[in-house]
Amino acid sequence: MIFQLGRYTIDVDVEKTKDFYASAVASNEICSCPCCQYFPNAIMSCSTIIVDFLNNLGVDPQKPGEVFGDKNNCSGWYHIVGTLLNGRVDVGVCDSSNAFIPDKTVDFIVWFDDDRNRMGWIEKNFPSPILEMSFSAKFPEQTNM
């Protein structure tokens, strides 16, 4: 399925991506750091637009390939079965000027890259072709999480 997301045009195999995430493990199940513990609940409560955006790509929002930072200000990535058709960004210039912002009311921005040499850790058995969606997120402090 073709998605036009700001400067990016991506071709995603939504079903293969969903199939992978169905058996993937959430960050809070494998890591005890504050960011990994906080992220799954924070992402689900930050914005229905963000959750729908990720779900439409076949991604389980609670299962990033990596998440790091502190619990309210974190970065990471999700992997998607797909290709980047248009919108490549040079290394080192991923900032808000070339990011896609799914919901302008929430501080959650993403970039897409298909260069395996620049990708972070890739989950075991992730199907090809691999597209990496990096993100930066700032969540409000939640006392109940």
Model-predicted segments: where are they?
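Long, hydrophobic N-terminal alpha-helical segment
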Residues: 1-44
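Residues in well-ordered beta-strands of folded domains
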Residues: 34, 81, 134-136
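Short acidic, gly/pro-rich beta-turn/loop elements at beta-sheet edges
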Residues: 43, 90, 143
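Glycine-rich, aromatic-bearing surface loops/beta-hairpins
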Residues: 106-145
